């Protein structure tokens, strides 16, 4: 689950980090009032969407008066912002953040952390190249990114943060401020179950103060049951409508750009299914895992979800029966096909628990379903069904 910038800054500030002060506004009048309340000569207005690249897309503007703040807010709120991280429709802008002017600054740094699956540790990354796309820095100048792996038994140690501060070229009070920032960020990461966080840029002001000018936080969705207050910050308007609907039925769904819909039980099998579709010349329209303990109702909802996509021209159902029984899946498929007006070819591959019984149920249904014997046969048939 992603947080908006203003939410991320509020959370980081509660852990002792110095952040760029700001006020969220949901309409132009609130934006004008926020400018006056901040009291500076300048302010920065940022569209609050769950996507990067806002500046290049026109979602970040510097304003010099309350009237200008009102006009910029009016041009953003209620519109969709399209960035390189969104689809063609973009993300809806329901609010803007009006932030204090912290410039001029002497330096812009980068600080971030992720759960590194290879090392199975929280890994911090820092760089002197803040304020730019960190992916570009990683690609073009990987030596400019410092990495610190944190031992989960002892947590991030002050000496590790000091070492990073020295390598970033900080000096004097800046070193202590950076150590506090990094330790506070780690504490927030662990206590709030972050999956990822970024401060880009982490600015060094002319007076030596270190300030978080931006904030990006992604929370581990599997841990949200432990954080009801954070869950309350969820903005469903920023989520893909199909993925949101899928989550409500405990389905793991990711929309893709192909034309072959996939319904599979198990994430690994789902990945393999997409790979073999690609191998046979097709393009998957989605990743959809109905789970190891799929119910009839969940399978029906999954089928509806796939067919809601106008780009889907064929469907491949690939089920390996373990906990879930193939005969139950077969009954759910029949019910779903009858309930939804299916006009595209549907290829079904069943293996495992009650697979033969499931295949017989499908064969006796009278529906125009295409049976497949094995994964390769299923991929071949679904690609050929497109003509």
UniProtKB/Swiss-Prot annotation:
The positions annotated for binding ATP are 46, 53-55, 100, 103, 108
Positions with a binding annotation for substrate: 265, 322-324
Cofactor annotation remark: Binds 1 Mg(2+) ion per subunit.
UniProt binding sites for Mg(2+) = 200, 214
Enzyme Commission numbers on file:
6.2.1.5
Please provide the Gene Ontology terms (biological process) for this protein.
succinyl-CoA metabolic process; tricarboxylic acid cycle
Q: What is this protein called?
A: Succinate--CoA ligase [ADP-forming] subunit beta
> Source taxonomy lineage?
Bacteria, Pseudomonadati, Pseudomonadota, Gammaproteobacteria, Thiotrichales
């Amino acid at each position: 689950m992603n947080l908006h910038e203003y939410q991320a800054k509020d959370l980081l500030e509660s852990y002792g980090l110095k952040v760029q002060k700001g006020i969220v506004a949901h309409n132009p009048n609130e934006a004008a009032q926020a400018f006056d309340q901040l009291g500076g000569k300048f302010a920065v207005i940022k569209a609050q969407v769950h996507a990067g690249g806002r500046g290049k897309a026109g979602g970040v503007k510097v304003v010099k008066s309350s009237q200008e703040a009102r006009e910029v807010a009016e041009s953003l709120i209620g519109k969709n912002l399209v960035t390189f991280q969104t689809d063609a429709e973009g993300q809806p802008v329901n609010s803007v953040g009006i932030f204090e002017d912290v410039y001029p600054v002497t330096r812009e740094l980068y600080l971030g952390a992720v759960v590194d699956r290879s090392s199975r540790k929280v890994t911090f990354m820092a760089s002197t190249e803040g304020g730019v796309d960190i992916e570009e820095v990683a690609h073009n100048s990987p030596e400019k990114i410092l990495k610190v792996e944190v031992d989960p038994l002892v947590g991030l140690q002050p000496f590790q943060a000091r070492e990073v501060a020295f390598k970033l070229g900080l000096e004097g009070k800046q070193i202590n401020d950076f150590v506090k920032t990094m330790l506070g960020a780690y504490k927030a990461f662990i206590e709030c179950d972050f999956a990822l966080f970024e401060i880009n840029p982490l600015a060094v002001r002319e007076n030596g103060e270190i300030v978080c000018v931006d904030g990006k936080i992604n929370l581990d969705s599997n841990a949200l049951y432990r954080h009801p207050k954070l869950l309350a910050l969820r903005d469903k308007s920023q989520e893909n409508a199909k993925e949101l609907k899928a989550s409500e039925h405990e389905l793991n769904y990711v929309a893709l750009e192909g034309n072959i819909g996939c319904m599979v039980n198990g994430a690994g099998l789902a990945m393999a299914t997409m790979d073999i579709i690609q191998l046979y010349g097709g393009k998957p329209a989605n990743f959809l895992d109905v789970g190891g303990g799929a119910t009839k109702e969940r399978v029906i909802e999954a089928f509806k979800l796939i067919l809601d996509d106008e780009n889907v021209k064929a469907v491949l159902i690939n089920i390996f029966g373990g906990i879930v029984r193939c005969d139950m899946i077969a009954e759910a498929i029949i019910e779903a096909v009858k309930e939804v007006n299916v006009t595209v070819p549907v290829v079904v591959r069943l293996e495992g628990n009650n697979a033969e019984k499931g295949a017989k149920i499908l064969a006796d249904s009278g529906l125009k379903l295409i049976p497949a014997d094995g994964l390769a046969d299923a991929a071949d048939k679904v690609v050929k069904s497109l003509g």
